[in-house]
Amino acid sequence: MGERGELVSDLHPSDDHDADPRLAPLLAWRQQLVDSGAVAPRSFKEAHLRLVLRSGRTDVEQIRAMLPGSVAEHAEEMARILAELTPAAPEPDPPPVPEPQPEPEPGPGKHRSPETDEPPVATTTEIPIPTTGFAPFQFSSQQVALHDITVQRTDAAVELSWPPYEAPEDEAAQDISVVMYRVVSSDDQAPYSPDPAHLVALTEEPKATDERQQVSPVRHYQVWVNVGASEAAARKTQPVLYATAVLVRPVTGFEIREDAGWVIGQWTAPPGVTAVHVFRVPIDEVDRDEAQYRILTAGENLAGFVDTEPVRGQRYRYRARCAVNVDGVVRLSEAAEADVELAAALMPVTDLVVETAADGASCDLSWTPPAGGQVAIYRSQNGPSADAEAIELPQGALEQVGLTPELRVTQDLTEETGSDGRRRARLTGVTWPSEWSRAYFTPVTLMGERAMLGRTLSSVRTGTIRDIELAEYCNKQVLTFDWPDGAASVIVYLAPKGHDPRSGLNGRSFEISLEEYERYGGMHLTGQLPVGGCSLHLAPVAFAGGRRVVGAFSSIEYRGLLRLQYAVRIGRDPNGFPTTATIALRAEQNVPGSPGFVLVNNPQRLPLSVHDGHPVDVAPLDARGQLADHPSKELRWSALTTSGDGELWAANLSGLQGWIRLFVNIGSPAQLRVIALLDPPVETLRLTAATL
């Protein structure tokens, strides 16, 4: 066959078929389809009509196979028109049958056309198409390629390669010593067979080179395989579509540049390209699927793009691929690409977060790392100068704003990815000198010899509340304590007795500032505490960076106070001397039963205690005002009520003078501290008329 691995020239003739009388009616029919919108002019060209006429095909399926996919539905109508335009011809007499002669074997690599004494006459029968020595393609069912052609564009040509041919199982027993690859191409539309297409190469190697310049937006490549026991046998067999590829023409004049943090791209897209896909790929991810990095999807980008969203300090690979719709599938060209490294900008940290530990002894810091440079954290007692934030200055000038080298935090930082997918830098367990009640943390972005201060935040460490005391003043309580260091105020929560503040506090609360505490000498609680007692939980409150910080809790128990009030009515004889006294008692709240009481008489003064005088005989009265029991030295009500109009007690005052007073008769000091017995007006307790 000669040098089959080399390219061979296109042997297809360019016969003029304008003289075919069927062309004009077919052109008029095509124009009707175009005008009605049934087909697009680009999809159904005059070349397709000429191709059908030149082939001589009149069968519907054969015509359908020669038309583009979007026009194939009109094949039956075209076959009908051809049948109407073809005149019927009388059948000629059969020619004499010549003596059979052995067919000479054609020379390897040569094409031989049959010799005739007269030029061929166009008829309605099939017209052979020059096929570079191969049997004409016979239309059958649609063929589907088994493989893809690998296409690589170089400066001078397009390199094509494909997998070597392997015979299917049904041909394994046949002799296929010769495998011939027919590499063909067609612009815009895929060829229906190898015959009308441009022959790129005829080779026995699974590769070829196309040195032609591509001028159309799309070029279709096909590899057809002819196999046989010999070259002659292979040429006589029907070709099989083996591999295909679609090559989209790339952009030209590709240029990329950075402009003040934006990236600008310029190019020229070939005519016929509908859009250019632009990709911005991080340089360390160039081997990953680029689809996720496509940008500017809303525009066609035919002349270029402007990317306003790259991250400063990062390096990207920008790619541009021409996009063309081929039979409903978007095909992309090879990429024109260039790397761009954006100059990093010195950016301050503005989202520093300070999380103080529960004990107030340490805190955790976190922030979003800027695109360029590194971040140093400075810890100070007073913070930097107020006008230094977000201002670029030399690193040597940090001391002038109050950030000296010894204030820099030297702990190792870690990076983590948050729930939103963004990176966060973190410093954990950061402490500060114990004598500081407040610490300021300032993030500083460093790049080269430049520095920029970010937003400063503070953390507060309040002292523990100690020496808590609750003084009872019968009608109010006064809470006192040592004021905690660093606290702006103290908050007090009320909770049930024995409540653990770690379980949460959501009851009533009271808050007092340092100024109020010093003015009133403590926190005064008038009628605020429950009679039955409660627990009080105190915590220091400070403010850091506009945030309210609550310190550790300290607690005290309030046992409560039962307030009782009694009234005395003294009965006298005609001479004004006391004879009896009636005693009534009411409580702040209803209580079943009561403690014991003693009515004490002191002839000299108002009794000061249960032992400061002599107990008076007393007895309960019934509903009629008569003694209901024998006299005794102790009063005990069956119930203490808020009305006090229930039981009455009577006292025998005959022969007594001076003063009387009622006392609670309980031996336990702890129990006495939860009962307050309020005296009536002192004049009602005096027995004699003598003045004090």
Curated annotation (Swiss-Prot):
Consequence of gene loss (knockout): Loss of DNA conjugation when disrupted in recipient strain (MKD8), no effect when disrupted in donor strain (mc(2)155). The recipient strain does not secrete EsxB. Disruption of the probable saeA-saeB-saeC operon completely blocks polar localization of EccCb1.
KW Lipid metabolism (keyword) present: no
Compositional bias segments (type: Pro residues): 89-107
CC terms in the record's Gene Ontology section: cytoplasm
Basic and acidic residues bias locations: 1-21
Keyword Cell division: no
Keywords: Cytoplasm
Compartmental location: Cytoplasm
UniProt main location, coarse: cytoplasm
Source species, domain of life: Bacteria
Region annotation Disordered: where it falls in the sequence: 1-23, 87-134
Function: May be involved in assembly of the ESX-1 / type VII specialized secretion system (T7SS), which exports several proteins including EsxA and EsxB. Involved in DNA conjugation in recipient (MKD8) but not donor (mc(2)155) strain.
Additional record remark: DNA conjugation in M.smegmatis is unidirectional with distinct donor and recipient strains; mc(2)155 is a donor strain while MKD8 is a recipient strain. Mutations in a donor strain that alter DNA transfer do not always alter DNA transfer in a recipient strain.
Protein's UniProt name: Putative ESX-1 scaffolding and assembly protein SaeA
Organism: Mycolicibacterium smegmatis (strain ATCC 700084 / mc(2)155) (Mycobacterium smegmatis)
